[in-house]
């Protein structure tokens, strides 16, 4: 079930929180709204849910308008056939797991036998079948989150909206819940719109990421596409760690040279891009795309300033003529601060965009 937004605007008397937003969230996919606090992502979600009243624009769910200022349409939340999972879980502490999940079904007037069937089926789906009669206060944080998700799923909504539902969990539990949410989406073919400020969460969950800034979408696309080919400095810096440096790029044959005020260096080798010649650009190299070599030979000279061993990888800060570079290499490394090395990469691993963007 798709969601379409056309020229949506929302403000609270000051600067626009949502600024002329137009986009579409695909049916039977996970769309993640990503961005810092105050960028408009949660307000967008609440407008879709009917919990906020936009100033103007249009929202369609499966082609049917649920909000349109010109036609004076503004369906209440209960008429939009959607479910929502909040950051706070909103679990009733005096009820059992079964009673919490059954509450919205009873409110809709479903027969008791149907309520029982749906609740038991949904609890089995989220792995809580053995806890149906346990009190809500006896559950862990992850179990409470699964109850909130089960309560949403039990109503068989056409659309699931999730507002930072994993932010209160520890790192290990967040990773487990991300997998469970992806599995749940595949099993139910639900359309999910998920809000987060956590870039790792967005990358692992999303079919499509919508990166927000100041009430607008700066870039949208598959996680790998946005990570590898950001449109500007903001996107590059927000989604992962980024080494960005200016230079004049000269591609001749199969080598890329970067000329800077501090010298000229061969950084990358590979097939030259069609039509490329010398031009000014901002260069992006992700930390894991740098290759490190012993001192001597060609490449960008550098000195290790500091390093951190992170278990599966070692992260270095390397001082170079084009500024400090973050370098990530797999596993444990024997290098130490003060060691000299050379850095290079492949043309396919370097992304260029216009200066000042």
Where are these regions (language model features)?
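Pre-Walker A (P-loop) beta-loop-beta motif of ABC nucleotide-binding domains
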Residues: 21-32
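The feature captures the beta-strand-to-loop junction immediately N-terminal to the Walker
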Residues: 34-36
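Helix-to-loop junction immediately C-terminal to a conserved catalytic motif
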Residues: 49
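Conserved coupling/switch loops of ABC nucleotide-binding domains, chiefly the family-specific signature
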Residues: 55-58, 214, 246
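Conserved ABC transporter NBD signature motif
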Residues: 57-69
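ABC ATPase nucleotide-binding domains
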Residues: 81-83, 87, 91-234
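Glycine/charge-rich catalytic "coupling/switch" loops of P-loop NTPases
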Residues: 228, 255-308, 332-357
């Amino acid at each position: 079930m798709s969601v379409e937004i056309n020229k949506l605007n929302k403000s609270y008397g000051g600067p626009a929180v949502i600024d002329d937003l137009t986009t579409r969230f695909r049916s039977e996919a996970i769309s993640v709204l990503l961005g810092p606090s105050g960028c408009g992502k949660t307000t967008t979600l609440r407008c879709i849910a009917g919990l906020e009243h936009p100033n103007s624009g249009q929202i369609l769910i499966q082609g049917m308008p649920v909000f349109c200022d010109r036609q004076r349409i503004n369906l209440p939340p209960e008429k939009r056939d959607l479910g929502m999972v909040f950051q706070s879980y909103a679990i009733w502490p005096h009820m059992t797991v079964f009673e919490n999940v059954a509450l919205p079904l009873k409110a809709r007037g479903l027969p008791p036998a149907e309520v029982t069937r749906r609740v038991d089926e949904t609890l089995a789906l989220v792995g809580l079948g053995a806890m149906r009669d346990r009190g809500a206060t006896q559950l862990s944080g992850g179990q409470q989150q699964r109850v909130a998700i089960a309560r949403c799923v039990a109503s068989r909504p056409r659309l699931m909206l999730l507002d930072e539902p994993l932010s209160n969990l520890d790192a290990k539990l967040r990773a487990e819940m991300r997998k469970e949410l992806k599995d749940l989406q595949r099993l139910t073919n639900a359309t999910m719109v998920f809000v987060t400020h956590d870039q790792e969460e967005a990358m692992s969950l999303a079919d499509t990421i919508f990166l927000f800034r100041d009430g607008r979408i700066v870039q949208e696309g598959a996680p790998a596409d946005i990570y590898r080919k950001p449109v500007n400095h903001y996107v590059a810096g927000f989604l992962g760690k980024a080494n960005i440096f200016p230079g004049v790029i000269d591609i001749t044959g199969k080598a890329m040279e970067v000329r800077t005020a501090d010298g000229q260096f061969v950084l990358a080798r590979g097939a030259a891009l069609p039509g490329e010649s010398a031009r000014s650009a901002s260069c992006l190299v992700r930390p894991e795309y740098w290759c490190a070599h012993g001192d001597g030979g060609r490449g960008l000279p550098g000195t290790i300033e500091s390093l951190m061993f992170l278990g599966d990888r070692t992260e270095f800060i390397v001082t170079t003529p084009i500024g400090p570079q973050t370098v990530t290499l797999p596993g444990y490394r024997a290098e130490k601060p003060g060691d000299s090395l050379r850095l290079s990469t492949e043309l396919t691993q370097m992304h260029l965009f216009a200066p000042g963007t």
